[in-house]
Amino acid sequence: MARVKRGVTAHARHKKVLKQAKGYYGARSRIYRVACQAVIKAGQYAYRDRRQRKRQFRQLWITRINAAVRQSQMSYSSFMYGLKKASINIDRKILSDIAIFDGFSFNILIKKAKEALL
């Protein structure tokens, strides 16, 4: 059986990892062994943070809605409960956009939520 030399395959693998590590600081972008670890860790962070991003945006939307609702002497939880009772199904992302860019419409939503609570 002929001897299999792996130089071409190994070089291709090293090149692939170093390409992924491009832009990293110091040895992480130049030395294969270190770059390999850095790329794996970066992948772990990316996987984790794709899930955290969803939580963080929801948290941001809730904070924005709460800030806008408190100007009308109402709490976030009672506002959301009032909207639910009034059968107004708008998600938090859209509510926060309305609160920021269209205060007039948001005030109407607050009034409807207050009426539904009475």
UniProtKB/Swiss-Prot annotation:
Entries under SUPFAM superfamilies matching the protein:
Ribosomal protein L20
Q: Which InterPro entries match?
A: Ribosomal_bL20, RIBOSOMAL_L20_CS, Ribosomal_protein_bL20_C
Q: Which GO terms describe its cellular component?
A: ribonucleoprotein complex; ribosome
Q: What keywords are annotated for this sequence in UniProt?
A: Ribonucleoprotein, Ribosomal protein, RNA-binding, rRNA-binding
Gene Ontology BP annotations: ribosomal large subunit assembly; translation
Q: Name one GO molecular function term.
A: structural constituent of ribosome
Looking up Pfam families in the UniProt record yields: Ribosomal_L20
Q: Where is the signal peptide?
A: none
Q: Please describe what this protein does.
A: Binds directly to 23S ribosomal RNA and is necessary for the in vitro assembly process of the 50S ribosomal subunit. It is not involved in the protein synthesizing functions of that subunit.
Similarity section:
Belongs to the bacterial ribosomal protein bL20 family.
NCBIfam families reported for this sequence: rplT_bact
This protein is called what?
Answer: Large ribosomal subunit protein bL20
